[in-house]
Every structure is written in C-alpha cells, then in structure tokens.
A protein has these predicted regions:
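Beta-strand acidic-aromatic groove motif in beta-rich domains, primarily in extracellular
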Residues: 30-34, 58-70, 105-107
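Short carbohydrate-recognition loop motifs
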Residues: 8-29
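Solvent-exposed serine/threonine-rich low-complexity stretches and specific carbohydrate-binding patches
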Residues: 75-85
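Short, tryptophan-glycine- and acidic/Ser/Thr-enriched carbohydrate-recognition patches
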Residues: 1-8
C-alpha cells in the first residue's frame, strides 16, 4: 500500500505478553505502529534502562522501538531499529538513555513494524523499563 490507510494491526495483551498480527504487508517505517500508552512519568536528566524480547513468525527488517513523552514526540529516550529472524527470540537492551528535552508526565512505548511481510505475527514480552542503577 501507499500512504493510504490500511487495517490497524491486531493487538492482544495477556499479562505482559503482547501479540501483534500484521495481515497486510507494508513497505516503509511508521506504517505499522502499535502504541503502549502509560501513566509512567520520566524524570529529566535521569538515565533509564529498557529491555524486551521479540519472537517473529517471519523475517522482518527495521523494527523500530521508541519511548517518548505522550505530549511530544520530540522528547524521547531513544529510537532504535532491529532486524528479527523468523522463529528466533531476539532480546533488545538499551542501557542508560535520557529524555532528550526534559521531564515527561507520561510515557508511551512505540513499536513500529513498517516494512513487515504479509501475515506477520510478532510476540513482545519481558518488557522492563527502570531507572539505571547508580
């Protein structure tokens, strides 16, 4: 598809285990986003660690993860891209990242699967976000 609207990914959650079904293939970043919107604040000038695990049904290149302020996409901890291999668990670890602009009242975790193949299924689990131990 071009930049026309397609069906949103099917998203289910079960006790910290998330499953994303992507029935339609996409070709560019930001075309297959899932947002986990929280009430978790982010402190200014404070490093945080993030980790999670993925398991994809098919190979998918350029999966994007971004943790950002719910009120400003310009105030974020990081934007990282990862390539997932079919059937292989992949662990993401992002240590000691700091908000770019300053404190955030609430954070959202964005997963983007733009560039996904048709019929993709991705599981996301073991999500950890915490202040870096000093």
């Amino acid at each position: 598809p071009g930049w026309t609207e397609i069906d949103a990914p099917d998203f289910t959650a079960d006790k910290g285990h998330y499953t994303v079904q992507l029935p339609t293939a996409t070709f560019a970043q930001w075309q297959a986003q899932v947002h986990l919107i929280t009430d978790i604040p982010g402190e200014a000038d404070t490093p945080y660690d993030f980790s999670c695990k993925f398991l994809a049904k098919k190979d998918i290149k350029g999966v994007t993860i971004k943790i950002t302020d719910t009120s400003s996409d310009d105030n974020f901890f990081f934007i990282k891209n990862y390539d997932l291999k079919a059937g292989e668990e992949y662990q993401v670890k992002v240590p000691a990242s700091v908000l770019k602009v300053g404190a955030a009242d609430a954070l959202k975790l964005v997963f983007d699967f733009g560039g996904n193949p048709e019929g993709e299924k991705v599981e996301i689990y073991d999500i950890i976000f915490q202040k870096t131990a000093q």
